[in-house]
A protein has these predicted regions:
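Bacterial Sec-dependent N-terminal signal peptides
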Residues: 1-38
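Conserved positions within compact, well-structured domain cores
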Residues: 36-236
């Protein structure tokens, strides 16, 4: 009886330790799952269904392709403009913008045999963006549909005022990540626009998607390949 009385609290302590260890493991992996991407390219969220498509709900924020091949950082205007190999950059060269807005990438990252998106995901094609446009507002006119506000975060923290039409009803969570212009302009447009790459070339240009702070449209049309845009990955 004495042995049983001693063993009972010890057994309870053992069970509590196992439970604590299990909770720590769950918390660790939950935190991992809320991160975006591991260098090896495994998806760890977040993503969501918009119409028939599954989109990642944050701008891409990686420094490697999904096989671990590094992507160089550009740290100056000249370095960005001179870089014909894959590169990423902080908007306004300011690392504090990274957490909210993600990174901007050059065309060499997109136009590459390696995939910068997680395994089973890819940089959207023009057709992918067109499907999203159709879901939001029907057939585009002059490359635009009304309904882009359904993609934009509400308020004026990540967008300039008035942030027209923003409802974020799709949970796409678009922020005003801006862009890096080609040539010597190095315009950022932080909080006033959000530009996203597609993989689809048209002539000497490439299709890209754009949202603005002062209208409710989603534009998907041709633009230059010398800029730096954000990436939103979509499921294969």
């Amino acid at each position: 009886m004495t042995v049983l009385l001693i063993m009972q609290p010890l057994f309870k302590i053992f069970k509590m330790k196992k439970l604590a260890s299990l909770i720590i493991s769950i918390l660790f992996f939950s935190n991992l799952l809320m991160s975006q991407v591991m260098p090896q390219g495994f998806l760890i969220g977040p993503d969501g269904l918009i119409g028939t498509q599954r989109w990642m709900l944050k701008n891409l924020d990686v420094t490697t392709f999904n096989d671990g091949t590094p992507i160089a950082q550009a740290t100056t205007n000249a370095g960005w403009n001179a870089n014909s190999s894959p590169a990423w950059i902080y908007n306004n060269l300011d690392a504090t913008n990274n957490q909210v807005y993600g990174k901007l990438y050059n065309w060499a990252v997109i136009n590459n045999s390696l995939n910068v998106c997680p395994v089973q995901y890819h940089v959207p094609t023009y057709s992918d963006w067109l499907v999203l446009q159709n879901f939001l507002g029907g057939t585009p006119s002059n490359y635009m549909v009304t309904g882009g506000g359904k993609l934009k975060q509400t308020g004026i923290v990540t967008w300039d005022t008035p942030n027209t039409g923003a409802t974020n009803s799709t949970k796409f969570n678009a922020v005003g990540n801006g862009y890096i212009g080609g040539g010597n302009s190095f315009s950022s447009s932080l909080k006033s626009s959000a530009l996203f790459w597609s993989k689809t070339v048209t002539g000497s240009n490439v299709y890209y998607a754009k949202l603005n702070y002062n209208d409710d449209n989603l534009y998907v049309g041709p633009g230059i390949t010398t800029g730096g845009f954000a990436i939103r990955c979509i499921h294969d």
